[in-house]
C-alpha cells in the first residue's frame, strides 16, 4: 500500500504557518524513521507531505500504522495529532487500473 501523510492546519487545509510547518515536518520525518517497519520506505513528497510504501500489509493495518505514527508524532505535543491526515491506496490497484477513478481512501483521525 501507498500512504500519504500530510500536515494540515487541523481543519484539512494546508498549513500556512511556515515556522510551525518546518518544526512539524522535522518531527514527522523523525517519527517515520522511528515508527516504520523494516522493509517499509518513505520519502518527502512536499514540505507538508511524506509518501510511504508499506510492504506486506493490508488496508485494515494501514490505519493501525497511521495511529502508531500519530501517537509518536504527538508524544511531546499532544495537540499535534489533529494536524496529521492520511490517505491510502493499493499500489497494485493503481498499476492495474484501466480507469481513471480515484482509488484513494481518505482517513481523517477525527472521524472515529
Where are these regions (language model features)?
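Conserved long alpha-helical elements within nucleotide-processing catalytic cores of c-di-GMP signaling
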Residues: 1-4, 8-33, 43-47, 59-67, ...
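A short glycine-enriched loop-to-beta-strand structural element that forms part of the catalytic core
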Residues: 1-3, 40-55, 78-111
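Short catalytic/binding micro-motifs of nucleotide second-messenger systems
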Residues: 34-39, 71-81
Amino acid at each position: 500500500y501507498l500512504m500519504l501523510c500530510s500536515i494540515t492546519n487541523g481543519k484539512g487545509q494546508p498549513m500556512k504557518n511556515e515556522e510551525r510547518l518546518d518544526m512539524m515536518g522535522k518531527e514527522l520525518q523523525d517519527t517515520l524513521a522511528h515508527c516504520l517497519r523494516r522493509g517499509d520506505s518513505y520519502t518527502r513528497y512536499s514540505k507538508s507531505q511524506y509518501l510511504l510504501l508499506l510492504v506486506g500489509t493490508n488496508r485494515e493495518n494501514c490505519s493501525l500504522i497511521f495511529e502508531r505514527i500519530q501517537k509518536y508524532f504527538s508524544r511531546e505535543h499532544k495537540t499535534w495529532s489533529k494536524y496529521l491526515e492520511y490517505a491510502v491506496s493499493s499500489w497494485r490497484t493503481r498499476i492495474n487500473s484501466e480507469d481513471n477513478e480515484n482509488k484513494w481512501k481518505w482517513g481523517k483521525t477525527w472521524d472515529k
